[in-house]
Amino acid sequence: MSALLVEIDKDQFQAEVLEAEGYVLVDYFSDGCVPCKALMPDVEELAAKYEGKVAFRKFNTSSARRLAISQKILGLPTITLYKGGQKVEEVTKDDATRENIDAMIAKHVG
């Protein structure tokens, strides 16, 4: 299932997220973030649910702090939905639940 939630690095971010057509959801996490790891299976399930409608990517901020700051990622986990390279909505920290992520996607994608 995790093949739908693809990990990208800072060198791929521009092409995979900022230059992508359509919707891209990015799961920002770090090596030491326990809530991030707990949330990952839920994000993988949502990737399957929205397959073909939203591209799901995960991004480890541990090795790319500058990029995380440039995207205004101030707390983890942060789940951000982009459309055509523009940030449209995000949920972060305690609000980053499966239900809230699903509702955010459904609101924009349908």
UniProtKB/Swiss-Prot annotation:
It comes from the Bacteria. One of its GO terms (cellular component) is cytoplasm. GO terms for molecular function: protein-disulfide reductase activity. Disulfide bonds join C33-C36. Residues 2-110 form the Thioredoxin domain. Keywords: Disulfide bond, Electron transport, Redox-active center, Transport. Participates in various redox reactions through the reversible oxidation of its active center dithiol to a disulfide and catalyzes dithiol-disulfide exchange reactions. This is Thioredoxin.
